[in-house]
Amino acid sequence: MNIRNARPEDLMNMQHCNLLCLPENYQMKYYFYHGLSWPQLSYIAEDEDGKIVGYVLAKMEEDPDDVPHGHITSLAVKRSHRRLGLAQKLMDQASRAMIENFSAKYVSLHVRKSNRAALHLYSNTLNFQVSEVEPKYYADGEDAYAMKRDLAQMADELRRQLVLKKSRYVVLGSEENQEAQDSTLPDAEEACQPENPAGKGSEACQPENPAGKGSEACQPENPAGKDTGSHSTDVQDSSEYLDSTS
């Protein structure tokens, strides 16, 4: 299962999912209104074949007299894919996007008083609180619970994760700089080799015998000029069960 941001080409399948799951339905222009105005806020759940099995349609409320806050317009998951935690993941993704993109302080929604499964998810899992009852909110005359979820705790957690992420980058960058610096420095043996300005001996083969005795590992260069023949040395890697709209 995959949760991702909804794209324009997903809107028709989102509407189809809505028609299968909910009594509250919307014309396609309403989906486009959300998708064009707040493209960051709506998400879909798709199965292994790329088919949409759930969605959340969300927006920001345009109330100049209130703090920035989002609203869940519609949430649905097909019956064949319920109790997999998809509704909770969709809601959390939308809420997180509201914080990151619009600094939302809370998110609101409406739910039918008779929708016990949705009420259980919102109240017990997602920490929504009932703010008021709106009489005859739905077209069939049923009342709705208006609910709100404070996003301060989620915002704090997102800030904490961001700080940790930045600190990891700083530490990683420091380690890479140190490795780069170390790679440019000579090792201890190279740093201690004399440059032999007098021209004596060979840097590749310094004699270990200061007393002047011969060594098989390092033959002298025959300064006396005697013919000794040729001499060479070879050196040998991711639970829900609901429908909800407002």
UniProtKB/Swiss-Prot annotation:
Q: Name one Pfam family in it.
A: Acetyltransf_1
Query: The organism sits in which domain of life?
Result: Eukaryota
Picking any one GO molecular function of the record gives: protein-N-terminal amino-acid acetyltransferase activity
Q: Which UniProt keywords apply?
A: Acyltransferase, Cytoplasm, Nucleus, Transferase
A GO cellular component term found in this entry reads:
NatA complex
Q: Where is this region: Disordered?
A: 175-246
Question: Does the keyword section mention Calcium?
Answer: no
CDD domains registered for this protein in UniProt: NAT_SF
Q: Which reaction does it catalyse?
A: N-terminal glycyl-[protein] + acetyl-CoA = N-terminal N(alpha)-acetylglycyl-[protein] + CoA + H(+); N-terminal L-alanyl-[protein] + acetyl-CoA = N-terminal N(alpha)-acetyl-L-alanyl-[protein] + CoA + H(+); N-terminal L-seryl-[protein] + acetyl-CoA = N-terminal N(alpha)-acetyl-L-seryl-[protein] + CoA + H(+); N-terminal L-valyl-[protein] + acetyl-CoA = N-terminal N(alpha)-acetyl-L-valyl-[protein] + CoA + H(+)
Q: Name where it's found.
A: Cytoplasm; Nucleus
Q: Report the top EC class in one word.
A: transferase
Stretches of Polar residues bias are at: 230-246
EC number per UniProt: 2.3.1.255
Interaction with NAA15: annotated span: 1-58
Q: Where is the N-acetyltransferase domain?
A: 1-152
Main location (coarse class):
cytoplasm
> InterPro entries this protein is in?
Acyl_CoA_acyltransferase, Ard1-like, GNAT_dom
Q: Is this entry keyworded Phosphoprotein?
A: no
Q: Which family does it belong to?
A: Belongs to the acetyltransferase family. ARD1 subfamily.
Described by its record, this protein's role is as follows: Displays alpha (N-terminal) acetyltransferase activity. Proposed alternative catalytic subunit of the N-terminal acetyltransferase A (NatA) complex.
What is its quaternary makeup? Component of the N-terminal acetyltransferase A (NatA) complex composed of NAA11 and NAA15. Interacts with HIF1A.
The protein here is known as: N-alpha-acetyltransferase 11
Read off the lineage from the record.
Eukaryota, Metazoa, Chordata, Craniata, Vertebrata
